[in-house]
Amino acid sequence: KTKLGTQDYDLYKRVVDPVREQTDLILSLTTSGIAGRNLPHEVRLIPLAFKPELASFDAGSINLGGDVFSNPPDFLDVAAAKMIQSGVKPEIEVFDLGMAVTALNMNKRGQLESPMYFQFVMGTPWGAPGTPKALLHLLEHIPEESAWSVIGIGQSHLPMSLMALIMGGHIRVGME
């Protein structure tokens, strides 16, 4: 109705239940909320009630268009604990090196479990460029046993996807 993203439980249920009944797809649901709206933690974490295999874990705040996509440390702490409690694997979304470092520090403190799964978001105007050099730089900083995938934004989609496949990573497709 509003054409905005939502964390509405009933709307998620209308989508998740038929997908679960009719397929064996791996579900990755978002805890990202909506940039600029600063939803309460409990609202952002509603999708974890559906026990998806993966859920987004944006490892820091970032400018997003004309708004700030806010992921302060207190939210990251709550989200990480809830994901462990729910048995949901965090899809650690990394828009820049600082987010990877945040996730690594949380792993050292036991807040994120190993092996970690990193999703490198490349080519946004406010984050890491969608270049082979930028991807290699990010990969140098994560543990070798980590799984990782790439999403290239705009023009970087195809080159980043091909690079990930060549290097043994994964690519992200689908809707958000």
Predicted regions and their residues:
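Short, glycine/charge-rich beta-strand/loop segments that flank catalytic centers
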Residues: 29-38, 96-99
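Catalytic alpha/beta core domains of metabolic enzymes, predominantly
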Residues: 54-175
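Short, electropositive alpha-helical surface patch
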Residues: 6-23, 43-54, 105-118, 172
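Short, acidic/polar
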Residues: 38-48, 157-161
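Histidine-centered divalent-metal-coordination microenvironment in nucleic-acid enzymes
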Residues: 1-2, 30, 103, 164
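Short beta-strand segments at enzyme active-site cores
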Residues: 1, 27-31, 92-93, 173
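Short Asp/Glu-rich motifs
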Residues: 3-6, 38-39, 102
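Alpha-helix-loop-beta-strand connector modules within alpha/beta enzyme cores
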Residues: 3-31, 78-85, 137-145
